[in-house]
From Swiss-Prot:
It comes from Streptococcus suis (strain 05ZYH33). Gene3D superfamilies: 3.30.70.360, Zn peptidases (3.40.630.10). It catalyses: Release of the N-terminal residue from a tripeptide. Cleaves the N-terminal amino acid of tripeptides. This is Peptidase T. One of its GO terms (cellular component) is cytosol. Its main location: cytoplasm. The gene is pepT. One of its GO terms (biological process) is peptide catabolic process. GO terms for molecular function: metallopeptidase activity; tripeptide aminopeptidase activity; zinc ion binding. Its cofactor is Zn(2+).
């Protein structure tokens, strides 16, 4: 179905810089997110007719659409995140490509282009309306597509009261991209039977498996002496960091894994001969494999420390989120409903694991099962990001089908 306000709404959202900051200690991590919620989303939620619209200390803008059919007793939530990833988000200047013809798309005057040889999925979008960047910023489809789709669906229901639906709660939150947005999610305030994050990618994605995730910080304590007299005395902290990294499986890296394969990802290395540190993210799907990856890091450190008279490799691990499959599989109702709705709309459900995490990962373990549905974005987190308006329209169709499902 066509929704006249969807594109304009999306364009308003993406032009707002809501980049999150992993080094911040505030919630939300950036003031821009607060202003986006308070100055744009909350007034719009009230304008279109949502009830009990409020802004929580955890950074979530929340509202309710009461049921208009007493036989539809479920309470269903829809969640999307306001922040964008760690890439330039200032001065987003979207391009609208009408009736895409399959050729390369110049991204403004940046010198970059979306080329089918680099991004073969462009072949799926012949004849569609694409929204791209101008090559200097990301687009922000992740996850302002989701916000626009939820808002458009709610507006459509309010303007068409003959469409019967259950009670709906919507929540637009901060800091998903830095992994902390749902840490303070208020389950009691949201009060639904289950929810969906509208935070997936291409048409049909329906996801209830995520990585289990941990972070690791490894400190290396060296001993610096003059290199001219260093034999049997110098202990180079940088070399220890290199040795540690090389002891990890070479094939278990993001660029060499797919599907259900986990990985270690070296994110940062800094220091000197005297001291050095590295940070990693650890990802896997099965609990046994996830625990084994963390143990391997501890084992490597123990083996390296055996060469010294005092521990010089110190590993600090912290879990970040867990595979929500463990929760969702207890009651597959939200998956079955979404799957039926997609199939009734002629959309083939793509039920596959998320090689990442969503706010739903944490919210599911807090007590609200929250799988993930496509929002349309492709090549997210960078200058080559784009989204199809037709896919966004179908995401709105899916939301409308879910809330009317009997």
């Amino acid at each position: 179905m066509k929704y006249p306000t969807l594109l304009d709404r999306f364009l308003v959202y993406v032009k707002e810089n809501t980049r999150s900051d992993e080094n911040s200690t505030t919630t939300p991590s950036t003031q821009n997110q607060v202003e986006f919620a308070q100055n744009i989303l909350l007034p719009e939620m009230e304008r279109i007719g949502l009830q009990n619209v409020h802004y929580l200390p955890n950074g979530f803008a929340v509202g309710t659409l009461p049921a208009n059919d007493p036989s539809l007793t479920r309470k269903i939530g829809f969640i999307a995140h306001m922040d964008t990833a760690d890439f330039n988000a200032e001065g987003v200047n979207p391009q609208i490509i009408e009736n895409y013809d399959g050729n390369p798309i110049a991204l403004g005057t940046s010198g970059y282009e979306l080329h089918p040889k680099d991004f073969p999925q462009l072949a799926n979008y012949h004849g569609q309306i694409l929204i791209t960047t101008d090559g200097t910023t990301l687009l922000g489809s992740d996850d302002k597509s989701g916000i626009a789709e939820i808002m458009t669906a709610i507006e459509f229901l309010i303007q068409n009261p003959d469409i019967k639906h259950c009670e709906i709660r919507v929540g637009f939150g901060p800091d998903e991209e830095i992994g902390v947005g749902a840490d303070k999610f208020d389950v009691k305030d949201f009060d639904v039977d289950f929810a969906y994050t509208m935070d997936g990618g291409p048409l049909g994605e329906l996801q209830y498996e995520t990585f289990s995730a941990a972070g690791a910080k490894i400190d290396f304590l060296g001993r610096n002496v003059h290199p001219g007299s260093a034999k049997d005395q110098m202990i180079n902290a940088f070399q220890m960091a290199i040795d540690f990294h090389n002891a990890l499986p070479e094939t278990d890296r993001p660029e060499k894994t797919e599907g259900y394969e986990g990985f270690f990802h070296l994110m940062n290395m800094e220091g000197s001969v005297d001291t050095a540190s590295t940070t990693y993210i650890i990802r896997d799907f099965e609990e046994e494999d996830f625990q084994a990856r963390k143990q391997l890091m501890l084992d490597i450190a123990e083996k390296m420390n055996a060469n010294f008279d005092t521990p010089r490799v110190i590993v600090n691990l912290h879990d970040q989120y867990y595979n929500m499959k463990k929760i969702i599989e207890k009651d597959m109702t939200p998956i079955n409903i979404a799957k039926d709705v997609m199939e009734n709309l002629g959309i083939k459900p793509l039920i596959e694991p998320v090689r990442g995490g969503t706010d739903g990962s944490k919210i599911s373990f807090m007590g609200i099962p929250t799988p993930n549905i496509f929002a349309g974005g492709e090549n997210m987190h960078g200058r080559f990001e784009f989204v199809s308006l037709e896919t966004m329209e179908k995401a709105v169709d899916v939301i409308l089908g879910i809330v009317a499902y009997k």
